[in-house]
Amino acid sequence: MSFLSSVLYTLSNINMIFYIVAFLFGGIPFGWLLVKVLYKVDIRDIGSKSIGATNVYRAVKEIDESKAKYLSILTIILDATKGLIVVLGAKLLGMSYETQWSIALLAILGHCYSPYLGFKGGKGVATAIGSVLLLIPVEGICGLIIWGIVGKVFKISSISSLIGVLGTIGLTFVLPYILPLPDCISIIKQINTHTPLVLIGLFIFYTHIPNIKRLFSGEENKVL
């Protein structure tokens, strides 16, 4: 297949178009934009250098402590919305569950490797939350609750995020077998495999490797 034929095929294939859109939309660096526009500061030069909510909080706290919490929450909402919107679009177009899960994964990859910031970005947690809420809402909401409880107890963002992710994945191995979940919100009924969710989990753990190292060395800062 020639290069031109490949391009034409891509432009005429709705799945391929959505894959590209998911990556590009997921790559919108809302945290970076908020801090850059409001305070003329590049959060990639501060703290963990991530563009996610935790580093937004850390960066803004040094400049305007009264706004730090609100901008951090806004960043979480916006980053989660990226994943939610692309999956919702796929659902409305009647795409297969396999495609929906692929789109969710690509939105997360886009956030972590933003094409607008030299393929650098955040840790992917908020975008993952938004991506899976429409696919596995029961486990997703339970994971959010776990995240909130662990955050309140330990007050360390990375611990709450990682345990929340583990909890969500673990529940997909349990809840579909003990609760009569509708086929449309059960990963087993959707695609008969946990593979995409496990890949998302592994990827989020990968982006948190520096945090995990700091946890073991006792150097991870409390933020929440």
Curated annotation (Swiss-Prot):
Regarding the membrane, this protein is recorded as: Multi-pass membrane protein
- Pathways involved: Lipid metabolism; phospholipid metabolism
Where does the sequence pass through the membrane? 14-34, 70-90, 99-119, 129-149, 162-182, 185-205
Predominant localisation class? membrane
Query: Which keywords appear in this protein's UniProt record, sorted alphabetically?
Result: Cell inner membrane, Cell membrane, Lipid biosynthesis, Lipid metabolism, Membrane, Phospholipid biosynthesis, Phospholipid metabolism, Transferase, Transmembrane, Transmembrane helix
Q: Does the keyword DNA-binding apply?
A: no
Tree of life domain = Bacteria
Q: Name one Pfam family in it.
A: G3P_acyltransf
* Stored InterPro entries: G3P_acylTferase_PlsY
- Whether Lipid metabolism counts among this entry's keywords is yes
Biological processes per GO annotation: phospholipid biosynthetic process
Q: Which reaction is catalysed here?
A: an acyl phosphate + sn-glycerol 3-phosphate = a 1-acyl-sn-glycero-3-phosphate + phosphate
Which molecular function terms from Gene Ontology are attached?
Answer: acyl-phosphate glycerol-3-phosphate acyltransferase activity
Please provide one cellular component term from the Gene Ontology annotations of this protein. Answer: plasma membrane
What HAMAP family does the database record attribute to this sequence?
Answer: PlsY (MF_01043)
Q: What role does this protein play?
A: Catalyzes the transfer of an acyl group from acyl-phosphate (acyl-PO(4)) to glycerol-3-phosphate (G3P) to form lysophosphatidic acid (LPA). This enzyme utilizes acyl-phosphate as fatty acyl donor, but not acyl-CoA or acyl-ACP.
User: Which family does the UniProt entry place this protein in?
Assistant: Belongs to the PlsY family.
- Quaternary assembly: Probably interacts with PlsX.
Q: What is this protein called?
A: Glycerol-3-phosphate acyltransferase
Q: Which organism is it from?
A: Helicobacter hepaticus (strain ATCC 51449 / 3B1)
Lineage here is: Bacteria, Pseudomonadati, Campylobacterota, Epsilonproteobacteria, Campylobacterales
